[in-house]
Amino acid sequence: MDVERVVPRKYLERIAARRFAPEEAAAIADRRGESALRAFYNCWTRKEAYLKATGTGLTAPLDGVVVSVDDKRPAILSLRDDDPGAWFLAAVAPARDLIGAVAVRLGDYRAGEPAVRLLTA
């Protein structure tokens, strides 16, 4: 799981161009204002939620995970080293200025027993 406060920052588009997959960076660059900001944070939190769930965190390349950037369509579109169909991704929006995501490997969940992996910072 990852949750971030939606805060305008100078270099978000540059970060997307350097770190995200080309299609994600293009989708963010095609937007303006609040829409671009929300798309960036949707992308970031979805990637980070997945990478935390795998146990690699931000040590793995961000462009190896391709996600949707739209508010209403959380999805893992492709993975460099895994099957995107093996993952469930949900958007989390606890407040207007917070965007987040939860990623769960579907095979880790057995009738009433979700596998939980706690990561410390």
Whereabouts are the PLM-identified features?
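Core catalytic alpha/beta fold that binds nucleotide/phospho-ligands
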Residues: M1-A121
